Each structure stands twice: as structure tokens, then as C-alpha cells.
């Protein structure tokens, strides 16, 4: 048997078990935990390589016979469910069909049956790439359709939220109010190459206005303080959600007019709810909304403008709040409202609670204090900042950061998918799931993806001058690919809706051409279902200093002065 050095092997086939990969310019390193391929029989595309007729490709295998449509070879997978592994990944009919060893079973041992390669199979060389699930942003103000382009450019493939363009209501709240608006927004998203789920308005003490939105296809409900986050509205929306199996997201009452955090928690009555702005900087009971993160029925999230906590966070947030919530800087009470939300102490605690796995989800709050194209970047930046500010996590090995990285990856992939009832289709790199996948060069991990695959087709990609002699000449920018056009888009993108809406035939009634899939299993889940982010410690907030105590320990970290994945990667 011939042998080669580990360095030569990595040059040819990429890293393998025990090898480490640095993520971008961060201090984070991941180590490959296991390799599912067979050494010496790697499936490699190209001139003189193994995926040729009669070698690594079975010349008798047809598409009908099971050959994958697309194979990603020798790729490093970073996935909150699978861990950090090396494998070939196959896609067929828009779904992940296999993860393991690809090739020709007639000439290669150990080929995974669903990864037998035939003439019908195309290939992406993943030897020096990282594969993740597409990101899921569960807090989107749908202010402009161009958000889809910005989101895809940072590896986000699913948007959950609401709105109907740049209305003041949309600028302030993630809600698509009413049946006609829901229909029109679903019709509009039919042409955008990204998955979507729309949230109806839950701000009603009466049941009928809520029910009609769910039956019109709302994939969830949103209760927002700008429309009145009253105890009555909370209770009614949760009752409707329990009946129809949709999730409720809430932005609580900053001014404590309708009650304090204790009253809101009592209104939850142990029922599952997704709390937006759990840290409070984006809104919610001042100063102690962060306490809800200690309850098992609460699925807590926070948004990317306060992640990671930096020296400019406080100044930036004040102006954001004034603009987004229709406040007047000439009115003293409006200024006081904004100032009550921007508390460096609770922002610092938010970062620590993310690192501890107490806050489970990271989202954007797009164009309404947050940036839809930065959730992956902010997640990895925060992981890096916390490593530098807090040191190694006890769960991590001495020479890698696998647990910490996977904890943060979970916050923007599988956990929002579980919270919104779509994890049976998206959110992880698992066989049978919709092939929403992102490929990254390690040097650009979290900042700039190389390819974004939607439903098995490349929909978004870095691409050079289309008139050039190669794909690589400048200007290399993000461009829509074939998966983002015409009816291919309809077969590779999903509109998520309530089960009641799907049963009511909204696809036909609204003339939707995209896939329409129901959300499910949103009511029986708890914090314990949040992958790698299920911690429920006791949390207290000092009402005078705003210091946050977690199991009696002050949860704080100094604001960072410089950030990874920053100006080295982006002009500013």
C-alpha cells in the first residue's frame, strides 16, 4: 500500500480526521471529528481524476436508477446536528440524498448506496471548502425585496417575518397584517429566490381577526409593542397558536404600561413562545426582559446589531430606535423611550448568554435596527469575541473550538428552524432534507459564501465578468444563477404557511407557483429542543445598575474595539 504525507493528502483531497481549519481571520479553529470516505478511493472531479467513465463513475447507472443529480466531493461539513465531519454529499430531486462515500461500487469499496455516481451526476469540488446548512433568519422586517439579495449574499436561504414594504408599520414591526396583505406578499415572494414564512398580526384580544390570518396562510403570529403587547393580546394569540399549530413571536412592552415582565410571563402560562429582543436593546420590558431566557417554555432570540458588543453599539442603537419606531427627537418622552432600551449592561450580558447557550437564536431585525446580510458574519464574530473575552468553553478540546462554533452555527440554522416549525425540511445537513446549502472558502467563512444552493440548484454565487474567458476575472461579485430564474425558482424555493392555509388551498387561490409547505410541531417544543443552546439558569437584573446576574454571577464582558471578519473583508 502506498502512503503519502498528511500535507500532501490535504493538498490533494483537503483536510481529514484530526486536521484543523482556521475560520476566516478569527481565533476560532475547528477539527475534523470523523471522515466518512475511504482513503485511496476518493471521488475527485477533473482531468486525470477518478470521476471518469468506468473508474469512479458507473457507466450503467441511470438517473432513474438512483444516480445523484449533483455531488459535492470531499467537503468539510460544519453542522449543528452532525458536528464537524468530512464526506461526499449527494443531492437528488432537490433533496440531500446521501452523506458518506461517493463513487462507483463496481470499482470502489465502501460506496454509500445513495452516492453511486453515474453519467447523470454533476460535481462541485469541495476538497477545500466548508459546507453548512443555509441560514434561517427568523426576524425580518420585509421593508424591501432587495433584502433577499443581501441575505443570500451572506448565506441566508430562509426569511421569517412580516411586513408589506416601507410602511411605518413594517419599519417598526415584523407583521403582515390581514388576509389581503398576506396574499399579496406571498404573490410577491413567488419571484424571489429565497424561502419565506409570513407572520400575521397577533395584537388582538379578539380571536376572529387572528384566526382569519392563520386560515389565510400566516405561518405564525407576531405580537409587537407598537400595536400593543397587552396581556389580552398575548393570551389570545397563544390560544390561537395552540389550536392551529403555529408559532408566536413577541416584542414585549418596553414602557411597562400594560404590565411588567412578571405579567407577561404569567400570560405565557407555560406555553411555547419565541421571544424577540430577549436582551432588551431592541425593545421589551425595561430593564429586565432578559429574565425570560431562564424559562423552559421560552425560545429566546436576539438580533445582530448588538452582536458582538462593541464600543459603538450604544451610540448606534439610539439613532436606530428613533427612526424605526416613529419617534420624534424633539419630544422628551420619545427620547426617554429610546434611551430606556439602550443599556450597555444588558447588551454585554446578551453576548455572555449567547456564549453560555442561554439565548438560542440569532436573527437580523432587517432594516429595522439590524442587517439582513450580516447574521452569519455577526454570529462568527461573536463566537470569536467571546473566545477572546471569556476564554475557552469547558466543553471544547484544548486545541479546537468545535463546540463553540457549532453552538453559534445552531443559532442561525437548526434552532430557528425548530422554533418556526420547519426543521423537518431545512436547518441542517441531513439526508432527506431540502438541499438549501452554503459552500464557503475557509478564509471567508461567515463573511462571504462561494455558492448558495437552493433546493439543489446554485441560485446565488460569486461570479466574474460574464464576458470573460474564465469564471474568475474581475469584477467578481454576487450574481443570481440559474436556480434564481423562471420556473426553476419555483421548484427550488418554499413558501411556508399554516397547515390551515395549505388545507384551504391558498396555493391555488393565490396563484402561487412555488412550493408551499406547512409549518408543524411548534407547540410541543421547549428550550430543551434548542440544539446546543438549551441552558436555563436563574437570571436577575439589578433595577438601578442594570447588572445581570446569572446563577448569582455577574454576566458581563468588555466591549470590543476591533472585530474579526471586518475591514479586511469589506470596504467601509
Curated annotation (Swiss-Prot):
Q: Which residues of the sequence carry a binding annotation for Ni(2+) 1? A: 139, 141, 222, 365
In terms of domain of life, where is this protein from?
A: Bacteria
| Subunit relationships | Heterotrimer of UreA (gamma), UreB (beta) and UreC (alpha) subunits. Three heterotrimers associate to form the active enzyme.
Quote a single Gene Ontology cellular component term. Answer: cytoplasm
State which Enzyme Commission number(s) the record gives.
3.5.1.5
Protein name as it appears in the record: Urease subunit alpha
Q: Which organism is it from?
A: Laribacter hongkongensis (strain HLHK9)
Q: Supply the InterPro entries for this chain.
A: Amidohydro-rel (IPR006680), Metal-dep_hydrolase_composite (IPR011059), Metal_Hydrolase (IPR032466), Urease_alpha_N_dom (IPR011612), Urease_alpha_subunit (IPR050112), Urease_AS (IPR017950), Urease_asu (IPR005848), Urease_asu_c (IPR017951)
Q: Which SUPFAM superfamilies match?
A: Composite domain of metallo-dependent hydrolases, Metallo-dependent hydrolases
Presence of the UniProt keyword Nuclease in the record = no
Q: Which reaction does it catalyse?
A: urea + 2 H2O + H(+) = hydrogencarbonate + 2 NH4(+)
Q: What does UniProt say on post-translational modification here?
A: Carboxylation allows a single lysine to coordinate two nickel ions.
Q: Can you name one GO molecular function term for this protein?
A: nickel cation binding
